[in-house]
Design a protein with these regions (language model features):
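N-proximal low-complexity "stem/linker" segments adjacent to membrane-targeting elements
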Residues: 1-67
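Active-site-proximal specificity loops/subdomain of glycosyltransferases
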Residues: 68-130
Length: 130
């Protein structure tokens, strides 16, 4: 069995959330302009022997999906000795497309980057593929 570490990241375009924001449901969203805890997490994973693939799931509010994924990719690039796959909206769409091709239907509510459960499930699907 190959170990897989799944790290969800929640990125917001603002420092504080207003009442009606979709992202307000996420407890610890990181502003787009700040690194957050991901660098520290990846730094600590450098010390783990036998570490397999690391999957970083990038959840963001609509309109900043690409910027959020680019931010996380820049952070992951600082750790070239780790095997890090950054999964943003584009990659999540490819997973959805493949599931539809396999006749599983459209499962965007259950598997994707919108909501804690769907994000967890996307990570589990990706880990199972590896």
């Amino acid at each position: 069995m190959n170990p897989v570490v799944i790290i969800p990241t929640f990125v917001s375009s603002r420092k504080r959330y207003s009442g009606g924001s979709i992202l307000a449901v996420y407890d610890h969203a990181t502003p787009l302009t700040q690194p957050g805890e991901l660098p520290r997490c990846l730094e600590s994973l450098r010390k783990v022997r036998g570490l397999g693939q690391i999957i970083v799931l990038v959840v963001s509010e609509p309109g900043i999906e690409n910027q959020a994924a680019e931010k996380v990719e820049r952070i992951a690039a600082q750790f070239p000795e780790l095997s890090v796959a950054v999964i943003g909206a584009s990659e999540s769409s490819l997973v959805q497309q493949r599931m539809e091709q396999l006749g599983m239907g459209r499962l965007t509510r259950e598997i994707g980057l919108n909501g804690y459960a769907a994000t967890r499930n996307l990570g589990l699907v990706l880990a199972n593929i590896l």
